Amino acid sequence: MKRRKLTARNADINRLYEESVQCTVFEVSFINKLFKRYNKTKCKSLREDFCASALISSEWVRHNKDNIAIAVDLDRTMIKEAKNTALSRLSSEQQKRIKICYGDSSKFNTDKVDCILATNFSYFVFKQRKKLIDYFKHSYKQLKNRGIFMLDAFGGYEAHQLLEERTKHKNFTYVWDQSSFNPITHEIKCHIHFEFPDKTARKRAFTYEWRLWMLPEIQECLKEAGFTKVDVYMQGWNEKKNEETERFYKVTKCDADPAWVAYLAARK
């Protein structure tokens, strides 16, 4: 049966977001590797903050029959979406090992877990230092002893610029649009657009109003919140192919690249 062509009218923007932005197999593998490296044991329980469609949590319970996941988000529409998609993606046994909860990630209490995940720069929504530290303190309390809090961040001098970046996928083009940036406050406004072969588009399918936090600030706030050690992992570079690799390495120094993405691992 011929696959229907994607257009602005029939596209599911949540599925397009997942395909464009998220790489759950990598992130689940990365969590497992880091946790075992730090603690010499397996990571069993995961909490996914700002979970949206809870894609990582779903992959987590699929990955291992002993894994459990808790997914938290403040958007009721996305929580409903996450529950519906979990039903279609997971077996009945796997569904028993995932909890999808409506709540404020900075305040919502759950069972303590081995790892808390805040990715896709979601915590950038906290624009004041106190609010960011309050969220980090809450995350610290929600972790088991020797637990890990994993976050991502982006930067580089292009992060301060107004720009549009296009990435072509099989049936659509993903557009990352940095539409405004205030150097004084580091407030940044970004949009995600989707463009289709028939020349239609879903403009501003997603909009983000953040503070662009810098790595030293994030590390300082994590330590102020109580975390004993914070490591930074940067993506490797293949000199022959002149492109990024899929591996991330723990670093204390890196080049002043125009754009970069990093992971931070904060240990309790």
Predicted regions, residues:
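Conserved class I S-adenosyl-L-methionine
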Residues: K42-A52
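Conserved SAM-binding loop of SAM-dependent methyltransferases across substrates and taxa
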Residues: S53-D66
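Conserved SAM-binding loop
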Residues: A82-K83
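Conserved SAM-binding strand-loop segment of SAM-dependent methyltransferases
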Residues: L90-S105
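A short acidic, Gly/Pro-enriched loop at the edge of an enzyme's catalytic core
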Residues: S106-I116
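A short glycine-rich, Lys/Arg-flanked "PGG" loop and its adjoining helix->strand segment in the class I
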Residues: K131-N145
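SAM-dependent methyltransferase
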Residues: M150-C221
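C-terminal lobe and adjacent flexible extensions of AdoMet/dcAdoMet transferase-like proteins
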Residues: L212-K268
